[in-house]
């Protein structure tokens, strides 16, 4: 299996990338969006019901624009019902929708700022700012791997590697290899899982290490991996499939992104 043949979702379910649930993108939106971001959507629903005139007076043809926005947001989800092509890596293939997803939060924040003279609005705005501050701190902690962000609805941080294929680009591989301290006086046999051997070779050579070979996992002493889904008779993450001792790892906010592991 290639890394795009199967996927892992927030409920620790595995799917073939051609057989993903129709709510796959919605699930990614719920579990990977900032907490304050989701709150603004809930607030907007109440605001639209109770303060619809505010938006109508502020924005020309507001109802039509809102309807168009909703259709744009629904479009990628509807695609999953009709297009047979594989979908993988969360919102990766639908990044063009992100600016549209930001419009509802923008409208909500605009309303709150414009109505700060009211006590209830002030309280809501302060609470929303606290949620944003919580997100922002966590966002900084995971630098430079912001695309691996998972919100609090994913449960314990140390178990979140089982929720999604987090570092699916293998962006942490450079840091992982730079942090490693292996003895290259003798030839080291590496295997990979979830990342390309050629990329690992490049970073090892760039570090000045040349005495190594890449072999199959059964012949390797060490394995370089992310938490991509692999196959050993059943779907399983690379981390869970290959047991051993971590020699080097890249971790952000208690979420392990990649490891070099000595195989037991």
Language model region names:
Residues 8-11, 127-179, 195-199:
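Membrane-proximal, lumen/periplasm-facing interface regions of secretory-pathway glyco-
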Residues 208-264:
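Aromatic/acidic, Gly/Pro-rich catalytic loop(s) in extracytoplasmic/lumenal soluble domains
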Residues 13-24, 30-33, 64-67, 80-98:
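Membrane-interface catalytic loops of GT-C/OST-like multi-pass glycosylation enzymes that act
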Residues 28-60, 108:
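Hydrophobic, aromatic-rich transmembrane alpha-helices
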Residues 49, 53-54, 62, 66-70, ...:
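Signature aromatic-anchored transmembrane alpha helix within multi-pass, membrane-resident enzymes
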Residues 85-120:
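Repeat-solenoid scaffold signature
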Residues 15, 73-90, 137-146:
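Transmembrane-helix signature of polytopic, lipid-linked glycan biosynthesis machinery
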